[in-house]
Amino acid sequence: MERKSSSEIRRMYLDFFKSKGHIIEPSASLVPQDDPTLLWINSGVATMKKYFDGSVVPEVPRLTSSQKSIRTNDIENVGHTARHHTLFEMLGNFSVGDYFKEEAIHWAWELLTSKEWYGMDPEKLYVTVYPKDEEAKKIWLETPIDPSHIVKVEDNFWDIGEGPSGPDSEIFYDRGEAFNNLEDDDPENYPGGENERWLEIWNIVFSQFNHKPDGTYEPLPHKNIDTGMGLERVVSVFQDAPTNFETDLFLPIIHEVEKLSGKKYGENKESDISFKVIADHARAITFAIGDGAIPSNEGRGYVIRRLLRRAVMHGKQLGVNETFLYKMVPVVGEIMKDYYPEVLADQDYIAKVIKSEEDRFSETLTDGLELLNTIIDETKTKGSDTISGFDAFRLFDTYGFPLELAKEYASDKGLKVDEAGFEDEMQKQKERARSARSTEKSMGVQSDLLTDLKTESKYVGYDTLRVDNAILENVIQDGKLTDIVEPGEARVLFNITPFYAEMGGQVADQGEIRDANGEIVAEVIDVQHAPNGQNLHTIKALKKMHSGAAYTLEVNRAFHLKVEKNHTATHLLDQALRDILGDHTQQAGSLVEPGYLRFDFTHFGQVTNEDLDRVEKIINEKIYDEIPVTTVETDLETGKKMGAIALFNDKYGKKVRVVGIGDYSKEFCGGTHVKNTNEIGLFKIVSESGVGAGVRRIEAVTSQAALEFLNTEENLLKQTAGLLKSAQLKDVPTKTEQLQSNVKALTQKISQLEAKIAKSQAANIGDEMVEINGVRLIAADVQVSGMDQLRQMADDWKNKDQSDVLVLAAKIGEKANLIAAVKDDFVKKGLKAGDLIKAIAPKVNGGGGGRPNMAQAGGSNPDNIKAALQAAREWLESQNG
């Protein structure tokens, strides 16, 4: 078998199925779109759910893809096994109600064994089938496969709950006896068992049943094919690699780490684990950040942060102590450039995000080492020789400390780590994560009600907002097809419509339906795309309507024009942000309504007011320049050559629409727009904020809404001017600065007076001194305005010989505040301020702590301050009694 590169294997797979009438679907973003059940795209079929459950009908029923995916349920195994990865690619071919078992099996055999394609030795191939699936077995026997290489396996049935399910057939490659890690009589020593010899390279799922909510199965209205071939696995076969890590997908990264560390891969088992972890995690982090995810403390951002910190810690185990992971980005980009050119294009941004996170982790790591040293000291103080599993997990979860590193540090101090306890805590976290996630469903139960609506419905809303003599073709009311619309809510299809269906962030049109007499018979309240692409109207029927009758459809013109202005303004905003912030900004979501527009975009860092002013200025200049807005319908490749921006997560058909605003902006867009930018009138940013890790949001208004916003702002400014006794609006900033200066001066005077009062009280607290068993104690209730003054009094006490122990209490606002201090000589005798404060804080319904010589507490019951001071005296008696 001829050696092939990963790029050749990927391209050959896609080309093969393209030759069989499949459309190549580009790899979707790792960040799921419109699917809250998924944290990441975790398989090839995850992006096909809408097709398989019937909610959308694809333009062509045959699809193929190489889909990048992330799975994080077993991160700890990465580096320890031959094939565990966080990021992987899944090659797949899919049939949506088209071909089935016959073609899927024969094509699989052809691709694998034909000299024109993969050219694998047929004697090396084994397949498994579901015992009851005699049809699949019969078809396999039609191929030249050795009949003894067909194995029946009971669990060859793909089923993850409600939705499409069915038997599957797995294909294995026999790597030979040299890879066999089991004894001959081991029950797992067979194709399909847990072993290293027979490597699963492809799984073909025959989706032929609907798993219904009641647990029963029924035949699918439309049978599907869903297959998955792990690219990394197949590459290891073609490159005769012992594990996936010795292939061209990982080795360049490993070689780069060799240069940085001075260590060689393959010489030490423990070091090899670190090399593998870094290579795997670098790929996942690079692609995830490139797709818009950013390190954070929750969700997918937390996954990235955890992977990054794990890779950094493994770098330290290899002796790489400086920031280095960001240097892997161009290496990953070079490996994947044939199919993912965007990685190299975005490498500067991706590397910047990674380096920033590495720098932040270096600071965190210092805190982690401090915590570890504290844990070690506390463990020794307790007389124990074992760091608890809870503490070890706390280090791992908060600071990214691998268990191995914690064990190494502990060993240097003569301690060990409770590994079983650590694993228990790890399991608890996994359970918490599982319960926190939405229940994952691969697909909904397939319904043919909407899928079977094949009536053609032409959208003409780009050219007109009114259509006469539109024929009512289909009616869905009360969950069933009918010919008559009764008063109430219904969904209807017309043969032609001017109503825009919600898409691309633009809300649906609203309007009216009139009968032949001009009487309003229904209101259109929403429009959505049906599975076959028609505009499906949700209406509120006022009178009966009949299928086959002609009606006049009219869009609410005022509503529609406001939406158009905001949509074109959104395109201007998108380009202006790229001009000011950089090309790394990508649209992450939008909402275009008549009242305002909302635009989410990726950006790492804050957006300054100066930047927002520049963006706003550019957009208004383009409005005043009266630039024509044009639309061109063409094919995708021609559109790209025109310079049109494609949204990364959007899928485009054979025909696309390019919306151009002169030479300034070109985007693929199916929405409606003004004819000239001057129709927008005015653009004003209302707010800018962060809505997630690495995602910013701008809200803005245009036209009349922008003018109303500015009028409101001006009225507020006039009110402020009145309060400041300012005759001119332009004087408001100066007057405000004067007011702030006066407030600051008065605040300083108040602070000085309070300090004098505090000093006066500090001089008098000596009168409260009592001696208890040879220890002088001052326990006093004082009057201060803040905790800072209370601490200052305690600091002043340190330099005086008024007592050996001090307890001060004060009511500040509606809270009780306590502070305790112990002179160093008495700390050595065993009196600790932290113990004292913990003993008295409950009296005021509070708690606290601190160092042996200084501690503080707060409580919600200031009425019990006297009781707390008395408790201090009693505590001292108990300590010295």
UniProtKB/Swiss-Prot annotation:
Q: Name one Pfam family in it.
A: DHHA1
Superkingdom as given in the UniProt entry: Bacteria
- E.C. number(s) listed in UniProt: 6.1.1.7
Per the record, GO CC terms?
Answer: cytosol
- What's the protein called, per UniProt? Alanine--tRNA ligase
HAMAP family, per the entry: Ala_tRNA_synth_B
Cofactor binding notes = Binds 1 zinc ion per subunit.
- Catalytic activity line of the entry: tRNA(Ala) + L-alanine + ATP = L-alanyl-tRNA(Ala) + AMP + diphosphate
Native source organism of the sequence: Pediococcus pentosaceus (strain ATCC 25745 / CCUG 21536 / LMG 10740 / 183-1w)
Q: Which GO terms describe its biological process?
A: alanyl-tRNA aminoacylation
Entry keyword Aminoacyl-tRNA synthetase: yes
What's the family?
A: Belongs to the class-II aminoacyl-tRNA synthetase family.
Essential cofactor(s): Zn(2+)
